[in-house]
Every structure is written in C-alpha cells, then in structure tokens.
Design a protein with these regions (language model features):
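Ser/Thr-glycine-rich phosphate-binding loops at phosphate-binding pockets of nucleotides
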Residues: 141, 145-146
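Cys-dependent protein tyrosine phosphatase-like superfamily
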Residues: 1-136, 148-242
Length: 242
C-alpha cells in the first residue's frame, strides 16, 4: 500500500484519506480527499506537485481568522483553487497563551467544537462531498480541528472505529516536525513553550469523541441527520471517498 503521507518540504502532515477499509469491504478512494497541517510554507516544488500530481481543486481552511491574518494562506492563494474558510473555533479560543498545554483537556476541546461549531463541521462535510476534484482540509497542526473532521468524514463512509482512531494517531509520526515548524510562528506560543510530546494524539481522546457521538446521536450518521445533513449530501460523500 502506498504511503498516506505526501513528501512535501513545506508541510509535514499532508496525507491521503484513501486506502482505509470500510464496512462494505471496500477501501476509501485514493487521491480524492486529503488532510494536512498548515500550507503557508509550501515551496515552489510543493506547489508544482499539488497542482500537477495531486490536482487539488479545493482547500478547506479550518483555522481562525486571526491565524489566517497573522500567518497567511500560503502560495496556493495565488492558484486557481477554490478556497473555503470554516473556522471551527473562535479567535479567542486559539490555545497560544496557555502556560502549560499538557493540562488541557483535549477531549473537552473536541466536545466544545462539536457543540459550538456543529453547523460549520457539517458545512465542511458538504464542501468535501461537493468538491469537483481532489480536496484538502487543514488547520495548523493537522491534528485537532482536522482530526475531528477526518473522524466524522471517515465514519460517515463506513470506516470502522479502530481504523478512525489509527488514522488520528498517524500524526504522531510527524509531530516533532509539525511542532518545530509551528514554534517559529508567534501565533503558536504554546507550541514554542512545550515539548512536542505534549501534543501527541492520544487514542483515548478520539475513542472518547466517538463514544460521545454514539451516546448523543447513535454515531456519526445520527449526528449528520441531527445537524441537518441531507441523504444526498451523505451519498455524495460516499461517492467521493468510498
């Protein structure tokens, strides 16, 4: 099986959601839906690969307005790629001033996003489903906001829970590089103040998030129904990803 990580120089966590098993026995489609950390430092070579090899048509940016103002959208802003901004957290909620990030309750953060940004998460699912070609969604590290959207998207196309959790944990393979990059930017002072190990993806966090979806909604499909996603949206998502 090909590596799910794409070997870009200017980001470390750009990876394909293809090749994941689903309940139907099929695999999710390669080369159609991607997740990533920030794209602001893509090199000229990276941009060429994104355009010619990935064939990217849509970017879904989950960062806050403040992050985008401070850090920019990166070189893909100047390309003919659709751009969708869906901030899953408010500007004041970016964890850049927490003195000890290890004390954060990450699961509580995820629940808060589900509670306060549910409509935006649903809009992101629809944006993935309606993209005319390859689409990437990203935040800063490609871990939390991106991880929630990936988990919901994968669950909606029938990827089993253990595989969803395993995909979430894949960020740990590149967390050192991701944190080293973010630590250079003043927007992310928490990353600068803590070792990369503090930001590792813990499987019990994603397990807890999926448990919550089960308890409240009977799973991701029930959440989608309750938030107002139509059957045609979910059918379109399955057609795109598998």
């Amino acid at each position: 099986m090909p590596s799910r990580f794409l070997p870009f120089t200017g980001c470390s966590n750009f990876r394909d959601l293809g090749g994941l098993p689903t309940a139907s026995g099929a695999l999710t489609t390669w080369g159609r839906v991607f997740r990533s950390d920030t794209l602001q430092e893509l090199t000229d070579s990276d941009v060429k690969s994104v355009l010619t090899e990935v064939g990217l048509t849509t970017i879904i940016d989950l960062r806050t307005g403040r992050e985008i103002t401070n850090e920019g959208r990166g070189p893909l802003e100047h390309e003919d790629i659709a751009y969708v901004h869906l901030p899953f957290i408010a500007d004041l909620e970016v964890h850049d001033e927490v003195p000890d990030a290890i004390e954060r309750d990450v699961l509580a953060d995820y629940v808060h996003m589900l509670d306060t940004a549910g409509a935006l998460i649903a809009d992101a699912v629809k944006a993935i489903a309606s993209s005319p070609g390859p689409v990437v969604f990203h935040c800063a590290a490609g871990k939390d906001r991106t991880g929630i959207l990936a988990a919901i998207t994968e669950s909606l196309v029938g990827v089993p829970r253990d595989v969803v959790v395993g995909d979430y944990e894949l960020t740990n393979q590149v967390i050192d590089e991701v944190c080293a990059r973010l630590a250079r930017f003043d927007t992310y002072t928490t990353v600068r103040a803590n070792p990369a190990s503090h930001f590792r993806c813990k499987p019990e966090v994603m397990e807890g998030f999926l448990d919550l979806l089960d308890e409240r909604h009977g799973g991701a499909a029930g959440w989608a129904r309750d938030i107002g996603l139509a059957d045609r949206d979910l059918a379109a998502l399955r057609n795109v990803l598998g």
